[in-house]
């Protein structure tokens, strides 16, 4: 391991190189040279200026290579040692890049990408009741969800996001889009005590969700969460049924919690207690809970989350845009709550950009605490990767660059004027880099973004879909 405070040297090297070899031809020496007896055949070798594994925290490996076989990381080694040890079918040279784990978006509503900018500068409940719910009633369909999720996946992949935790209607169509794009998704099996075009009542939501899980449970890119929308839209009876299913199936429970002061006031008026206390009494506060937003928490509620091993999905941009308040992230982290980062949906953010969320989370923590050391860059990066994976209970497979884990990876280019000079790559990733600096993305070892271009879906297809939906939804902007 080398010191993180490294200055960029000459910029004369190429931005990247991809070396592909015909079957049976070794990637070293002449075409007639055979690999040595101790050389191991692999699918992919990625050489990077810096490999940032995230675990251990703060480590930066200079001039290292990541060896990949069958979609998994086989080894992380100094480049010279890796070149001697492995016979790679493909080698990618990234001499001016940092290789990081693929980012994990811990909370989003992917297909709402089609509603980006539809209704801005409004408080949450006005936004929902006056604009979003009516628009959803008129437009949301399986095709809406499929097309919107395609658009969201394209945006997320180009920004280094390789896994997203989804909560929306028609999750099967979201799954289809994610699989078509080659992206990893945790599908929320949504439950709400309101009829929609997707389901007539809570039992219908749950039945459809369970059928979907049974159908897709063997898909390696998919996992599942129970996804009750929020305490103010789900009844005690539905929560009890959902808890039983979550325990039987061992699934996380992904839900909006304590997002606004109004939500809390209405819960006290209706139930005689704050939402988190109600959830505790119903048995839902436990290690499976992913509490989204979690803005208005007192000390006792933070302690409750800690004691029960809960996770929080922190969505700073969405929280600010709705003027909902400031989540006590510094206190949660200090006390031991696992906190990941989410974008929320495009209709409320309006970007699916975890680089933005990392930077904003770190800056807000410093400004609100009055402590410049609060939420350092390495912790922000962990929140966007390993901590999000941990909340989804996928940290055994993704979230860090370690032998045995899936090769969900993103490369960030530093060889551009706005990224120079660089003394500390991790600091640069959080305070300087943007998603526009992401050059390559792999999911399970499969290259999905190369030199900033999507490999899997023609750009003009997405543009045509966007135009069609924009024409249909344009009437909503006049509401």
Tell me the role of every PLM-derived stretch.
Residues 173-295, 300:
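Metal-coordinating catalytic core of metallo-dependent amide/deamination hydrolases
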Residues 98, 116-182, 205-218, 467-478:
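Alpha-helical scaffold segments that flank or form the walls of functional sites
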Residues 114-147, 184-203, 261-288, 308-311, ...:
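Active-site gating loops and adjacent loop-to-helix segments of metal-dependent hydrolytic enzymes
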């Amino acid at each position: 391991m080398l010191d993180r405070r490294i200055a960029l040297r000459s910029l004369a090297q190429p931005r990247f190189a991809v070396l592909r070899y015909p079957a049976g031809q070794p990637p070293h020496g002449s075409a007639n040279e055979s690999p040595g007896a101790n050389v191991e055949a692999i699918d992919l070798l990625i050489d990077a200026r810096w490999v940032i594994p995230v675990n251990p925290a703060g480590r930066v490996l200079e001039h290292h290579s990541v060896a990949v076989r069958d979609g998994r990381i086989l080894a992380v080694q100094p480049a010279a040692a890796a070149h001697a040890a492995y016979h790679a079918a493909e080698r990618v040279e990234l001499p001016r890049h940092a290789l990081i784990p693929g980012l994990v978006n811990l909370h989003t509503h992917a297909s709402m990408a089609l509603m980006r900018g539809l209704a801005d500068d409004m408080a949450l409940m006005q936004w929902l009741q006056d604009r979003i719910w009516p628009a959803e009633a008129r437009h949301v369909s399986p095709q809406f969800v499929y097309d919107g999720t395609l658009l969201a996946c394209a945006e997320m992949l180009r920004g280094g996001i390789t896994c997203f935790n989804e909560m929306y209607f028609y999750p099967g169509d979201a799954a289809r889009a994610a699989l078509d794009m080659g992206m990893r998704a945790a599908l929320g099996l949504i439950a709400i005590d309101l009829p929609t075009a997707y389901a007539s009542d809570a039992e219908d939501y749950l039945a459809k969700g369970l059928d979907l899980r049974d159908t897709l449970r063997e898909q390696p890119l998919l996992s599942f969460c129970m996804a009750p929308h929020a305490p103010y839209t789900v009844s005690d009876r539905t929560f009890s049924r959902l808890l039983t299913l979550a325990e039987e199936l061992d699934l996380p429970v992904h839900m909006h919690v304590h997002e606004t002061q109004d939500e809390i006031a209405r819960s006290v008026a209706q139930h005689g207690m704050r939402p988190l206390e109600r959830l505790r009494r119903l048995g839902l506060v436990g290690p499976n809970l992913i509490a989204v937003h979690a803005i208005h928490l007192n000390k006792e509620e933070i302690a409750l989350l800690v004691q029960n091993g809960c996770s929080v999905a922190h969505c700073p941009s969405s929280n600010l845009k709705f003027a909902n308040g400031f989540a006590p992230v510094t206190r949660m982290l200090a006390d031991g709550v696992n906190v990941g980062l989410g974008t929320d949906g495009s209709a409320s953010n309006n970007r699916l950009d975890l680089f933005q969320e990392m930077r904003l989370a770190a800056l807000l923590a410093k400004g609100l605490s009055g402590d410049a050391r609060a939420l350092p860059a390495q912790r922000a990066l962990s929140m966007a990767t390993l901590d999000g994976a941990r909340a989804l209970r996928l940290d055994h497979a993704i979230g860090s660059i370690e032998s045995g884990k899936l090769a969900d990876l993103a490369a960030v280019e530093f060889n551009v004027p706005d990224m120079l000079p660089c003394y500390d790559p991790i600091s640069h990733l959080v305070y300087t880099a943007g998603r526009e600096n992401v050059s390559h993305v792999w999911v399970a070892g499969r290259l999905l973004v190369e030199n900033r271009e999507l490999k899997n879906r023609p750009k003009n297809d997405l543009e045509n879909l966007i135009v069609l939906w924009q024409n249909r939804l344009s009437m909503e902007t006049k509401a």
